[in-house]
């Protein structure tokens, strides 16, 4: 497993598009949650767009809790995603995707990030769009999520 992880790190440095990045799911990742959490943080801090995106997608796949991932939910995931989103479209979209999935699987953990306007405006907008497009987010949650954006834009208009 350690050799495959090392080869995966080399391969990730060569990835130059979101589709290839999002398809990578080395089986070795699902073996050790503590080690994977450390690796995800390193990928998020790498400064390489698709390595950061891979870290975000991996957090989404493995650390959002029951029914969605191999490991218990990590309450630090929302803050990690916001910090990693940056200014690049592909990393912001991955963070928005993670937040939309978080609103499905860990609603109480992720919703305050929207209601308290803790997301940068563009990431908030992208998250709302991804959540509204999702078939897994129930209609009553979609209504609440939609209102977070309406409230935010109305507050911005008043200033």
Which residues does each PLM region occupy?
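Glycine/small-residue-rich hydrophobic helix-like segments
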Residues: 86-118, 123
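HEAT/HEAT-like alpha-solenoid repeats
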Residues: 9-16, 40-45, 79-86, 111-115, ...
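Alpha-helix N-cap/helix-start positions at coil->helix boundaries
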Residues: 17-19, 49-50, 89-90, 121-125
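Single conserved hydrophobic/aromatic residue that forms the stacking wall/gate
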Residues: 1-11
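Structural detector for internal amphipathic alpha-helices that build alpha-solenoid repeat scaffolds
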Residues: 20-31, 53-66, 94-102, 126-134
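Eukaryotic acidic, Ser/Thr-rich intrinsically disordered low-complexity regions
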Residues: 112-159
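Flexible loop/turn segments at the boundaries of HEAT repeats in alpha-solenoid HEAT proteins
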Residues: 5, 34-39, 64-74, 103-114, ...
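A mid-sequence, solvent-exposed acidic-amphipathic segment
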Residues: 41, 45, 49-84
């Amino acid at each position: 497993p350690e050799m495959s992880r090392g080869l995966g790190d080399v391969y990730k440095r060569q990835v130059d598009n979101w589709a290839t990045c999002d398809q990578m799911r080395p089986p070795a990742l699902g073996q050790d949650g503590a080690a994977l959490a450390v690796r995800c943080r390193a990928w998020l801090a790498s400064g390489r767009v698709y390595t950061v995106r891979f870290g975000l997608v991996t957090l989404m796949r493995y650390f959002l809790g029951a029914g969605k991932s191999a490991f218990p939910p990590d309450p630090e995931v929302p803050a990690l995603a916001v910090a990693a989103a940056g200014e690049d479209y592909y990393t912001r979209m991955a963070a928005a995707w993670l937040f939309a999935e978080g609103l499905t699987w860990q609603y109480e953990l992720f919703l305050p990030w929207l209601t308290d306007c803790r997301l940068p405006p563009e990431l908030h907008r992208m998250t709302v769009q991804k959540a509204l497009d999702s078939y897994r987010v129930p209609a009553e949650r979609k209504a609440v999520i939609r209102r977070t954006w309406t409230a935010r834009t109305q507050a911005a208009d008043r200033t």
